[in-house]
Design a protein with these regions (language model features):
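Position-specific recognition of the canonical hydrophobic site in helix A of tetratricopeptide repeat
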Residues: 1-4, 21, 31, 35-39, ...
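Structural signature of tandem alpha-helical TPR/SEL1-like repeats
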Residues: 5-18, 39-52, 74-86, 110-117
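Canonical tetratricopeptide repeat
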Residues: 9, 30, 64, 98, ...
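Helix-start (N-cap) detector for alpha-helical repeat units in TPR-like alpha-solenoids
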Residues: 27-28, 43, 61-62, 95-96, ...
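TPR/TPR-like (Sel1-like) alpha-helical repeat modules
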Residues: 72, 85-95, 99-129
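Terminal, low-structured helical/coil segments at or just beyond the last alpha-helical repeat
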Residues: 120-157
């Protein structure tokens, strides 16, 4: 919504809540409300909303990837890794999941596998190198963004 573009989170949330009052399973509204809650720093609520969006529309890969990122933000590394690996098996060309798994694996010390996933992600979508794009447009949580940027700093250094 325009409110999201203006970072008016309460107005944006009100728009999505209005939609959800009429259709509690509207996957797009659930996902977008998850983005709003994440932008407000409420990653627990964000995770719940992304998961509900993915359940409402099972092929909604971005909702599942966002749920994995929110789980990672809350230190559920094993849950995040499992979900990202499932996404990559199902959608091998899904750059978001590959980029996220790169940062997560690097954080866990698996640098070789991280580099392998990053090679695929970078070839699919070079925007994942851009911190501001990750935070402001794609709206990754701070922890995954920091880890991916740290990984890339070593790769570039």
């Amino acid at each position: 919504t325009a409110e999201e573009a203006l970072k008016d989170w309460s107005a944006a949330a009100a728009d999505y809540l209005w939609i959800l009052e009429r259709d509690p399973n509207d996957a797009a509204a659930l996902y977008n409300l998850g983005n709003v809650r994440g932008s407000e720093g409420d990653w627990n609520q964000s995770l719940e909303l992304y998961s509900r969006a993915a359940d409402a529309q099972p092929g909604f890969a971005m909702a599942r990837s966002s749920a994995a990122l929110a789980a990672w933000q809350q230190d559920d590394l094993s849950g995040a890794e499992a979900e990202l690996r499932k996404l990559i098996r199902r959608y091998p060309l899904f750059a978001d999941a590959r980029a996220a798994l790169s940062g997560l694996l690097w954080q866990q010390g698996a640098s070789g596998e991280a580099e392998s996933h990053w090679a695929a992600a970078a070839g699919l979508d070079p925007r994942y190198r851009q911190r501001d794009w990750l935070l402001e447009v794609r709206r990754w949580p701070p922890q995954p963004t920091r880890q991916l940027m740290a990984f890339l700093a070593l790769e570039d250094g």
